[in-house]
Swiss-Prot record:
Keyword Plastid in record: yes
Pfam families, alphabetized: LbH_GLGC, NTP_transferase
Species: Hordeum vulgare
Subunit structure: Heterotetramer.
Protein name: Glucose-1-phosphate adenylyltransferase large subunit 1, chloroplastic/amyloplastic
GO-annotated molecular function: ATP binding; glucose-1-phosphate adenylyltransferase activity
Entry similarity comment: Belongs to the bacterial/plant glucose-1-phosphate adenylyltransferase family.
Amino acid sequence: MSSMQFSSVLPLEGKACVSPVRREGSACERLKIGDSSSIRHERASRRMCNGGARGPAATGAQCVLTSDASPADTLVLRTSFRRNYADPNEVAAVILGGGTGTQLFPLTSTRATPAVPIGGCYRLIDIPMSNCFNSGINKIFVMTQFNSASLNRHIHRTYLGGGINFTDGSVEVLAATQMPGEAAGWFRGTADAVRKFIWVLEDYYKHKSIEHILILSGDQLYRMDYMELVQKHVDDNADITLSCAPVGESRASEYGLVKFDSSGRVIQFSEKPKGDDLEAMKVDTSFLNFAIDDPAKYPYIASMGVYVFKRDVLLNLLKSRYAELHDFGSEILPRALHDHNVQAYVFTDYWEDIGTIRSFFDANMALCEQPPKFEFYDPKTPFFTSPRYLPPTKSDKCRIKEAIISHGCFLRECKIEHSIIGVRSRLNSGSELKNAMMMGADSYETEDEISRLMSEGKVPIGVGENTKISNCIIDMNARIGRDVVISNKEGVQEADRPEEGYYIRSGIVVIQKNATIKDGTVV
């Protein structure tokens, strides 16, 4: 008898499939089941396959009928392989609060990037935080640095106010600080931010069974089960696993690009390549046919800035091996792949990097499409944000098309098309918004306050009568007067007008937070 033959495998649902089976060796054991009836034999076989109450994952057994055996003969594969399932209790997440936020200025002039409002009532920090909770990960560190007051306030109200059950988990905000004897300076990169608080993490790990560190960014829009990423990390016995996404030609140079072999091991990493270096990072993405339409449009694989490290590997890289390097993407990862098992996890669902005013604006406008590419609402994986206890929005004789209207708004005889209206927004008679994002207000003004302001020739919070706005981002608490036109009709791409209350970035007008646009202004 030959040492290898093909036989019919009996999976749990009873359908046969072809599988190679080795007859000798410790990998399998041939068992005879006596002269039982066919029904009793099948039931016994299936019970053996199921491993009793524990299931096949616990026993590692698989039943097959060999081609030369009688129906009563059963071959049971008792494999030595047992899948090591990833445990979310062994994962700690580190969310990076970002740098100075120059790419999103002026939205970041008084707030950290993760605190920027998105989608009407959320903040960017809600994305990784909610993904963590929905993945079962409840040990979270948020590292903050610049303009962190509003971010800290939002985290406290949303995640530290008792609304979410952490059981044995926690959310800790780690603000940039300086240790005695340490050179002055802010975080010098993503890796340096983690390194500065390595002592906090080490102390935490002594009391918790943390095996894997998940590094996340606070400026992206996506929905992910992080435990699928961690599971691949465990299955591959990887030192580092990068979450990657296919990207097109137009934006490829904005990201760190990767190449990996047939086993998923990363063999090349190039941070924001240009010219010939960019061309060299092209890959055949036809293997993504099952997940995306026309993968040829996405000839690059980009790192999402989402990483999983083995705990000891991360500590060694930051403290010893690359103690002088400051950034994961541009410095540590390109070096680490040569002597560490660095694996790629390809993410094919919606993902948008909110790195510029243009990408931020486009991502918000895409939420208004029908059907949208991304939905905040999902009953199984909801996104959390600060509870505000606001009344429902009131509208009177309004025309609304493809719009997101947040709670607590007052809309009167206005027209809204393909726009997002944030909490506590007020739009008055004759006003029109098209392709606009209005972030709303932190508080209400009473009718008496509004009347007093108008009698004094001042502008109340909101959009005044007969004002027309398009292709615009209106930051919080903005006061826009009557008969204003904001459309950038001349097509200016870049402009700084802080004394007039606005900037222009990539052709998009951005009204500053707390700005006042006087009656009759044309932008």
